[in-house]
Amino acid sequence: MAGKKAPYGEFAGRKLKLKRKKFRWSDIRYKRRVLRLKEKSDPLEGAPQARGIVLEKIAVEAKQPNSAMRKAVRVQLIKNGKVVTAFTPGDGAINHIDEHDEVIIEGIGGPKGGSMGDIPGIRYKVVKVNRVSLKELVKGRKEKPRR
């Protein structure tokens, strides 16, 4: 006859606690959180936003069944020198961004911190250009400061 798996009894609390602690390591989400793997691999280093310099403007092809060229920029982050691609949301938003502009980027809001919708491999979006909101620039409410 097979024995019982869990320790039962009045004083089994410590043993149960230790057992639970041991088996938590097989949970991937727990492991990634405790070992801080996201912050270590994330270009933004766990921060909600980051500042960077625009290196070039690019167009990325949308995934099937859509057909479009999604406008994006390659940005070099100031804090660690890493280069990431950031989407420029809004109609004609790319026209308000030039090379060597200072931009603020943030996550695009896809599942599990990944890319969103039909834009493949792009995890970030541009929020501000030269300290002015990109949304305001696109709507024509504000003008980009001349340097």
Swiss-Prot record:
For this entry, list what GO says about its biological process: translation
Which Pfam families does the annotation name? Answer: Ribosom_S12_S23
User: TM spans, by residue?
Assistant: none
Which portions of this protein are annotated as coiled-coil regions? none
Taxonomic superkingdom: Archaea
Keyword Endoplasmic reticulum applies: no
| Keywords on record | Ribonucleoprotein, Ribosomal protein, RNA-binding, rRNA-binding
User: Which PROSITE patterns does UniProt cross-reference here?
Assistant: RIBOSOMAL_S12 (PS00055)
Subunit record text:
Part of the 30S ribosomal subunit.
Q: What is this protein called?
A: Small ribosomal subunit protein uS12
Native species: Thermococcus kodakarensis (strain ATCC BAA-918 / JCM 12380 / KOD1)
Q: What is the lineage of its organism?
A: Archaea, Methanobacteriati, Methanobacteriota, Thermococci, Thermococcales
